[in-house]
Every structure is written in C-alpha cells, then in structure tokens.
A protein has these predicted regions:
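Conserved ATP-binding/catalytic motifs of P-loop helicase motor domains
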Residues: 1-398
Length: 398
C-alpha cells in the first residue's frame, strides 16, 4: 500500500523513469529546472538500495552531499589532472576494488558537469582493476544538459577536444555502448506562469528573449545571484558592514580526509546581529529547509535565525564527507565517513554564486550581470531560481 501511495505522487514521465530504473534499465533522466529530478531520483535510490548494491556519485563534493552519495573521484580514484587514458587510471587497493566490483547500479547526479573523459575514466578504471565495466552494470545519469557545464581552463579544453568531439559526457567512448533510455521531465513545478516558463525555455535552448528587459532595474530585491564569486563577496561584505554592533566569528572544526571545498559551510563564519543569513540544511522537524533565508539573532551564547517573526535555534551541524566501503558480512557497499566539518549551518545571504544556487528556489531574486556569465547554462540557472516573475530583478550595470 505504501509503495502505491508513493507512485501516485509521480507525474507520467517521473513514473516512466521510476519503472525503467526498477527494471534494471540504463536511463538518462533529464529535464528543465524545477521539474522534480531530485525528488524522483531519491525515490529510485531508496527502492533500488533494498535489493541491489547502488553507488550514488556526483562530480563535486557539495553535489555528492546533496544527493546523499560520494564524489566520482573518491569512489573510482580518478586522477585530477590531464585527460584520462587507460594508462593513467589507477590500480586500486583491494578494499577499493571490492567496492567497485560489487556495484550493481551506478547513479551519477549533476551529469551536465561530467566531462567525457571522466565517464571513460570510470569505465577504464573498472576494467583495469578486473571489475565489470560500465557496459556490464546498470547506469543511471541525472541532470539537465542546459544547466551548468564542466568548468575548465582553455588549455585543458583544447587538450580534451583533441581526443573528443565535444566536452560533455555524451561524447565519451563508452556512451553509445550504454544505450540509455532518455526521459525528459517537462512539467515545471517551481514556476506556474506560462509566459515566464516559455521565455525561460528560450534562454535554456541558447536563444535570446527581449521579454526579460522589463525586469531591468538599478536596485536589488531579495537575494542577489551573480556569475562571479568576487561580485558575491562584495555584496556580502557590504551587507555585513552595514550592520552596526559586534562582529561574531565562528571557526569550523574540520577533521579527517577532506578539505574546506568539500562542504557548503563556511570555514570561518562572520556574522552580526540583524544580518541576512541562509540556512544550509534541512532541520530535523522540517521547519527550516536548505535555502531558507532569515535574519541572524544572538541571545547570550545562543544563535537563532528569525523567519517571519519567529525565531529558530541554530545548532552546530556535522557535515560528513563519505566514501564507499564493501561490507564482507552483508556483501553490500556502504557509505563510510572519512572526514567532516562541524559548523553552524548558515552563511551570509545578501548574495550567492549562480553555481552554488543550483537546486535552490527563492521568492525574490536579483540577477547581477554587471560581470557577464562565463559558463554555459549560468544565465538559465540564475533566471530559473525564482518562483515567480514578480520576484525577479536584473541588473546589468552598477
């Protein structure tokens, strides 16, 4: 009965993806921003994990944490330098080889950020270590190819284009052998304004639309999204400096095999009473979600976020970096903590980078394009974060 209730919540195409995945088929789940890719992916992960060894991976640490998995690089010991070839794929330790050899299903999230040599690198690493290759297991990939693309410098890009016809995973040598069934979700759940959705799709497909000119303004409204981190830092510094009162500093506790960039928290958090902050996790009682924006309050040693006139306590949160291990007793692969950052799960919320905003939703957004977008998909991701056109402002000159 419970399973039927879950399936009843799905759209027709979500249900199609769910059914194909549970039948063991290779599936490429695509779709516009806000169509429920993450929601249905997590349903599939939970169901497949009951009867198979499923490894869930993503190209970045933050994306891996968001989907509840590990990074591609840590799982398959992928080299972080150069275009991946058979000769520079790593021989693995026995415990890592046991993990890879036991994988029945591999799900890769944020596939738009995966280069062709990364997918080939996974396959070649598996084969080099005597394991089943990608063409011998179930592979599910999830993401919107019109959103954020792999970030690389010009030298690396030219190296990659000497071997491949393009820069995304579909140009990998292994791609055609996987024979993906493609499901594209097209029912947008984040926005309901049809005209707005139509013009978002024009931008998504690389076109230009004069529709967005009417949102041009000189003043900000809501959270600022910007392509460049330097712009984000200026807004957040200006917002913090505008607050009077004492500056409070909280350093994170980091331990294990990890680095600061593996997490979405601040290694050094600086806040003042009254400053604008964003909550970065889902609270246990679901009163706060990742992306909730409010006001920072400090009462004695206690920290709070004020939302809609109500104050919620902020406690330090342990964010874990995990890697897969093989449990010989259960013959299952399991996620094991290898490092962690413990910090208050908040950050200044006057501005955030477009890259960091992927997957988030806001009622009011100012898109600051005074420094232009530098990567494919940035403009579309920025525009599509807002729930309604009435909440959108665009700045092109400061």
């Amino acid at each position: 009965m419970e399973q039927k209730n879950i399936e009843m919540k799905l759209s027709k195409k979500q249900q199609e993806f769910y059914d194909l995945a549970l039948r063991g088929k290779n599936v490429f789940l695509s779709g516009k921003a806000g169509t429920g890719k993450s929601f249905v992916s997590k349903l599939v992960i939970n169901e497949l994990a009951k009867k198979k060894n499923i490894a869930v991976v993503a190209p970045t640490g933050v994306a891996a944490t968001n989907i509840g998995g590990a990074t591609m690089h840590s799982t398959f010991s992928l080299p972080i330098y150069g275009v991946m070839e058979f000769q520079n794929c790593n021989f693995l330790r026995s415990e890592k080889r046991a993990v890879i050899n036991s994988i029945d299903t591999l799900l890769i999230d944020e596939i738009s950020m995966v280069r062709p040599d990364m997918l080939d690198g996974i396959h070649l690493t598996m084969k080099k270590n005597g394991c089943r290759g990608l063409d011998e297991i179930q592979v599910i990939v999830v993401g919107d190819m019109k959103q954020l693309q792999p970030v690389m410098d010009d030298n690396f890009k030219s190296m990659l284009l000497k071997k491949y016809q393009g820069l995304d995973f579909t140009y990998s040598n292994i791609f055609k052998k996987l024979n993906f069934s493609t499901i594209e979700l097209d029912e947008v759940l984040r926005q309901s304004d049809n005209e707005f959705i139509t013009h978002l799709n024009v931008v998504r497909d690389g076109g230009k639309s004069n529709y967005f000119r009417k949102f041009l303004a000189n003043e900000t409204k809501g959270i600022v999204l910007a392509p460049h981190n330097s712009t984000v830092k200026k807004y957040n510094k200006k917002g913090l400096d505008a607050q009077s009162g004492e500056l409070f500093t909280y350093d994170a506790h980091i331990e294990g095999k990890c680095k600061e960039t593996d997490f979405n928290f601040e290694s050094r958090l600086e806040v003042k009473d009254g400053c604008k902050i964003m909550y970065l996790v889902n609270s246990k009682n679901n009163q706060l979600v990742n992306g909730t924006i409010g006001t920072f309050r400090k009462r004695g040693d206690n920290l709070f976020i004020e939302v809609g006139g109500e104050q919620f306590a902020i406690d330090r949160f342990k964010s874990e970096k995990k890697e897969y291990v093989y449990n010989e007793q259960t013959e299952k692969i399991e996620l094991q903590e290898v490092g962690s950052m413990t910090q208050y799960p908040i950050k200044l919320a006057y501005a955030v980078s477009i890259h960091k905003s992927q997957g988030m939703t806001f009622d009011e957004v100012t898109l600051d394009l005074s420094m232009p977008c530098f990567a494919e998909g940035q403009l579309y991701v920025g525009l599509s974060r807002v729930t309604s056109p009435s909440g959108l402002t665009i700045i092109v000159n400061r």
